[in-house]
Amino acid sequence: MGMLVPLISKISDLSEEAKACVAACSSVEELDEVRGRYIGRAGALTALLRQISTIQDMDERKAVGSAANAACAALKLAIQDRESQLAREQLHSRLASERIDVTLPARPRTCGKIHPISGVIREISSILSELGFAVVHGPELEDEFHVFDALNTPEHHPARAENDTFYMTKRLNGRRVVLRTHTSSMQIRAMESNPNPPIKIISPGRVYRNDWDATHSPVFHQVEGLFVDKHVTMGHLKYCINYFLSRFFARKVETRMRASFFPFTEPSAEIDVKDRHQKWVEVLGCGMVHPAVLENVNIDPEKYRGFAFGMGVERMAMLKYGITDLRNFYSNKLEWLNHYGFCFTDILGRA
């Protein structure tokens, strides 16, 4: 009994001391320090376990070993329980600090807008598709034949002057290459690919002219239409234009045709509409396809006739939505784009 009572008493004291330290820990790091101090390799309880081998009496050795092992197991369990408790407290603290106030108003959902040019092109295309027009697209870099020659625009015509048209330095098949000045070039391509009408197409797209002010831009957009078939008349053209304008401006519009001149149509006309201030405003040009244009694409003008029309997308948007400066379309001002842009849901009904 010589070493039994002092050792067991020391084990009990160390166990109670360690449990008190565990209970006082406020972090995992402090728990790790207590674990090392008592049951680590150099810990106090570990040192007592090493002394067991020096006890000669087997019964005493067994009793001390049992007490020491029980103390170590109890301390490990206390540390484990305290770790779980600290984790719960930490979680509750984090949840309390991150709590969401459900009474706060939701953040407004911001979304992009469809650019007014894209929106108006879709709007125009949708209306004309109701009349059976198919949408076609073509190259913006064209040769002189499709932009000028085939459209009955001779070499000396002012539209072909270099101060109005962007010419490239390289040639294609011996012809000069230009940035197209109108989308009428697609009408030529459509008739070339289908020499046996009917042909009923519109060609929206970007065009280029050397001009820049409040009402002109070197890059702008057009939509041009073509209908070729037997027995096509100016009456068909007038009905088509009136239907389109009434649908586009969402009201019954009063129109007038003024005689004009375009090299690719004969007769030619410009269409005016009365605005809300009862003033006549020009909106587009049109006319019957010139017989020379039909001949240039191997369509018999004695058998077929057609009409064509063209409009500037920016101009149509300015007239409909009260936009005063064409340059705003390309200024990238977010406030302006948010005001005049189309929401996706606005486009669904027009697509």
UniProtKB/Swiss-Prot annotation:
One of its GO terms (molecular function) is tRNA binding. Keywords: Aminoacyl-tRNA synthetase, ATP-binding, Cytoplasm, Ligase, Magnesium, Metal-binding, Nucleotide-binding, Protein biosynthesis. Its EC number is 6.1.1.20. Binds 2 magnesium ions per tetramer. Its main location: cytoplasm. It catalyses: tRNA(Phe) + L-phenylalanine + ATP = L-phenylalanyl-tRNA(Phe) + AMP + diphosphate + H(+). Mg(2+) binds at E266. It is found in: Cytoplasm. InterPro entries: aa-tRNA-synth_II, aa-tRNA-synth_II/BPL/LPL, Phe-tRNA-synth_IIc_asu, Phe-tRNA_ligase_II_N, Phe_tRNA_ligase_alpha1_bac, Phenylalanyl-tRNA_Synthase, tRNA-bd_arm. One of its GO terms (biological process) is phenylalanyl-tRNA aminoacylation. GO terms for cellular component: cytoplasm. Its cofactor is Mg(2+). Tetramer of two alpha and two beta subunits. PANTHER family: PHENYLALANINE--TRNA LIGASE, MITOCHONDRIAL, PHENYLALANYL-TRNA SYNTHETASE. Belongs to the class-II aminoacyl-tRNA synthetase family. Phe-tRNA synthetase alpha subunit type 1 subfamily. This is Phenylalanine--tRNA ligase alpha subunit.
